[in-house]
Amino acid sequence: MQPRVLLVAALLALLASARALEEEDPSLLGLMQGYMQHATKTAQDTLTSVQESQVAQRARGWMTDSFSSLKDYCSTFKGKFTGFWDSASEAKPTPASDAF
């Protein structure tokens, strides 16, 4: 839903109110006002749910990107230290080779 829908609904409500006053039929005026209130509430609820959905999608995207970056950082960090530990264990003589 777009804000234009709310504007159209408000204009229709004003038009319906003006026409109902011309007709001098209070039941028609009440019926139209009730209908327009219901239509306005439905439009507002739909707009709110769309906005909440967009916010939820952005939050999920942000969390996914953050966890992906953290995972990449941990993999890089682990890779650097794994290479360090492997080279350190190869350079260090074992106690069995000192005995010979």
UniProtKB/Swiss-Prot annotation:
Biological process terms from the Gene Ontology for this record are:
cholesterol homeostasis; lipid transport; lipoprotein metabolic process; negative regulation of high-density lipoprotein particle clearance; negative regulation of low-density lipoprotein particle clearance; negative regulation of triglyceride catabolic process; negative regulation of very-low-density lipoprotein particle clearance; triglyceride catabolic process
Gene name as annotated: APOC3
Mod. after translation:
The most abundant glycoforms are characterized by an O-linked disaccharide galactose linked to N-acetylgalactosamine (Gal-GalNAc), further modified with up to 3 sialic acid residues. Less abundant glycoforms are characterized by more complex and fucosylated glycan moieties. O-glycosylated on Thr-94 with a core 1 or possibly core 8 glycan.
Task: Cite the residue spans of the region called Lipid-binding.
Answer: 68-99
Instruction: List locations, semicolon-separated.
Output: Secreted
Report the main location listed first in the record.
secreted
Which residues in this protein are found as Methionine sulfoxide? M63
Q: Which residues are glycosylated?
A: T94
Tell me the superkingdom of the source: Eukaryota
Q: In the record, what lineage is assigned to the organism producing the protein?
A: Eukaryota, Metazoa, Chordata, Craniata, Vertebrata
Q: Name it.
A: Apolipoprotein C-III
